[in-house]
């Protein structure tokens, strides 16, 4: 006789927990969205790079062209004099400086 009210109370408790968590999660989402994407001044353009598949960086330049142009450039290492590709320059300098310290 007491099993049915206890079961209903448990279902109500779980429903209330789910509702509160959903509401707080949604409120957090709306708050973050309004803080990051909100445009309070209509004269200032909104800079966003949230479009899926966007190839533009924050300066509206094509990311793929920038990657290929910098990676294809070669820089000379001042420690050993070798020519290193731009994409590997930081790693090389790190190793080169470690060798020099030893």
From Swiss-Prot:
Disulfide bonds: none annotated. It is found in: Nucleus. The keyword Nucleus applies. GO terms for molecular function: transcription coactivator activity; zinc ion binding. A zinc finger (SGF11-type) spans 75-96. Transmembrane segments: none annotated. The long N-terminal helix forms part of the 'assembly lobe' of the SAGA deubiquitination module. The C-terminal SGF11-type zinc-finger domain together with the C-terminal catalytic domain of UBP8 forms the 'catalytic lobe' of the SAGA deubiquitination module. Component of the 1.8 MDa SAGA transcription coactivator-HAT complex. SAGA is built of 5 distinct domains with specialized functions. Within the SAGA complex, SUS1, SGF11, SGF73 and UBP8 form an additional subcomplex of SAGA called the DUB module (deubiquitination module). Interacts directly with SGF73, SUS1 and UBP8. This is SAGA-associated factor 11. It comes from Scheffersomyces stipitis (strain ATCC 58785 / CBS 6054 / NBRC 10063 / NRRL Y-11545) (Yeast). The gene is SGF11.
């Amino acid at each position: 006789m007491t099993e049915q009210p206890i079961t209903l109370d448990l279902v109500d408790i779980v429903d209330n927990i789910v509702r509160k968590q959903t509401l707080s999660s949604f409120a957090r989402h709306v708050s973050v969205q309004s803080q990051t994407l909100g445009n309070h001044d209509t004269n200032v353009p909104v800079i966003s790079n949230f479009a899926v598949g966007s190839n533009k960086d924050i300066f509206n330049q094509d990311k793929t062209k920038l990657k290929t142009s910098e990676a294809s450039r070669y820089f000379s290492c001042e420690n050993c004099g070798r020519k290193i590709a731009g994409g590997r320059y930081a790693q090389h300098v790190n190793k080169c400086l470690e060798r020099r310290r030893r």
